[in-house]
From Swiss-Prot:
GO terms for cellular component: small ribosomal subunit. It comes from Methanococcus maripaludis (strain C6 / ATCC BAA-1332). Belongs to the universal ribosomal protein uS2 family. This is Small ribosomal subunit protein uS2. Pfam families: Ribosomal_S2. The keyword NAD does not apply.
Length: 221
């Protein structure tokens, strides 16, 4: 596979791990899978990811930034998503999605977007549920194990890694801005700007020792 016609170099795609899936797959995602490794890990087709990413950015560019809502609850996506919103002007919800945001006019942060952009259809299930309820199209980053029945536009990708999600948000932001004529070949932001936001995230680990003897097995009768 050459770099010709790709949105970035093949080396950049591979280094980001954008093609690394999981050890589960669904029939919905089968068409985007390139192969399965000896360890059972499914590998996504980079060229198909590039193609869908390009088309997704083109689709989103039909909408004004204020008419798009981009959502994520994934820890490593929060920083890159905020950067995505900063450079594009697109509305973002990074972190908990408050129930009723799209369906309850009395909600404090009620919004009426025309399209929803998700980082993960399973993790962002509340936002997806409400988008379905109000009937707006949904663009979603989907890994090999996802069900996609309610995703109108699938972007097959590793949506869990710091590097991969940073690259996705960077490329979509860049192409969205280009398609709308807001930037030219000189891009005022970089992949590293997005990656920096992801790398600064520190995940708290639960180091408390487990309490033994709290739960006891009942004798069989």
């Amino acid at each position: 596979m050459s770099d010709e016609n790709l949105l970035t170099t093949l080396d950049t795609y591979l280094a980001s791990g954008i093609h690394i899936g999981t050890q589960q797959k669904t029939e919905d995602m089968r068409r985007f899978i390139y192969r399965v490794r000896a360890d059972g890990l499914y590998v996504l087709d980079v060229r198909k990811t590039d193609e869908r990413l390009r088309l997704a950015a083109k689709f989103l560019s039909n909408y004004e930034p204020e008419d798009i809502m981009a959502v994520t609850r994934r820890v490593y996506s929060v920083g890159p998503l905020k950067k995505f919103g900063q450079v594009t002007g697109i509305n973002t919800v990074a972190g908990r999605f408050v129930p009723g945001t799209l369906t309850n006019p009395s909600a404090k942060k009620f919004a009426e977007p025309e399209v929803l952009f998700l980082s993960d259809p399973r993790v962002d299930k509340q936002a997806l549920k409400e988008a379905i309820e109000i009937g707006i199209p949904v663009v979603g980053m989907c890994d090999t194990e996802h069900l996609t029945a309610h995703i109108d536009f699938i972007i097959p990708t590793n949506n869990k890694g710091r590097k991969s999600v940073s690259l996705m948000y960077y490329l979509i932001a860049r192409e969205y801005m280009k398609n709308r004529g807001l930037i030219g070949e000189e891009v005022p932001f970089s992949y590293d700007d997005f990656l920096e936001k992801a790398m600064n995230v520190k995940v708290k680990m639960n180091t408390a020792p487990r309490q033994r003897g709290r739960f006891q097995r009942r004798p069989r009768r």
